């Protein structure tokens, strides 16, 4: 990110690291420890660890966590799967306008949490990412389509549970998804596929799980737990370096709260095409006179760059590189 580094005081990251895992007897850790963790905070907790199968130590561990989930508003995670499944719990979503499903990322199934845990939680959200062509994660889908059901991302679910809203609204036009709205929260603009750009310039307060259980950092609104132990969790490449699942969701959640994550508006392609046509027509009219065509080309490039930064400041992301390239070739 080219933005200056900022510090987020609303989100605390808790790392389940090698030392903690060794101290509790190995991985996967007993589920009851997650129950102890979420009891230690007054914030909204979220756990990005997948727990699809019963605890190896017995069902008592699962029930210990489920009992705490019943008492404490907590968000759990699940991930998209290439294998068809029966799906999982999903929050009701009101579709305003066109059907959003043809525009959304679609998966055959999901790897869900153990039902006793998912049913006891206040929300379940996806931690699935969609890398760009260069392998880096820059944009994250806020909603995906699995079996014609709409599932929110983990960060969006954290925000919904934090605001106490029961559902979402997804606004779709003929050109794709335009925005997602939590009723008591400002509208979140997205690209046509319900993705938002994520900024990577945010520093979060973080603790190891061992230190957190002894004395948690106070003052956070959200606490997100994730595994960082080498050989257990694999970080995902991003423009800000490799990030673990809870780090990615924290950056996404920060952007949703701050409202500073730029999005590609649904009218972007139309606007870029219209500008390209206008510039080409101007260059065509002045093509026989370099004293006119050169200043027009340079002025157009300057205006495009200025316009891009202007709209970036408004939260819109426009890609004018193609327009400039076409004008240069002309």
Language-model segments: what does each one mean?
Residues 1-186, 217-293:
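Non-transmembrane functional regions of envelope-associated proteins
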Residues 298-330:
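Membrane-embedded alpha-helical segments, specifically the hydrophobic cores
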Residues 67, 107, 201-204, 313:
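Short, isolated positions within intrinsically disordered regulatory regions of eukaryotic proteins
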Residues 64, 104, 198-201, 310:
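Short linear interaction motif-like sites in intrinsically disordered regions of transcription factors
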Residues 100, 194-197, 306:
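Intrinsically disordered regions, especially transient/low-confidence alpha-helical propensity segments
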Residues 170-215:
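Substrate-access "cap/lid" subdomains that shape
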Residues 30, 208, 319-320:
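A diffuse structural propensity rather than consistent per-protein peaks
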Residues 96, 190-193, 302:
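Intrinsically disordered, low-complexity regions enriched in Ser/Pro/Gly/Gln/His and often acidic
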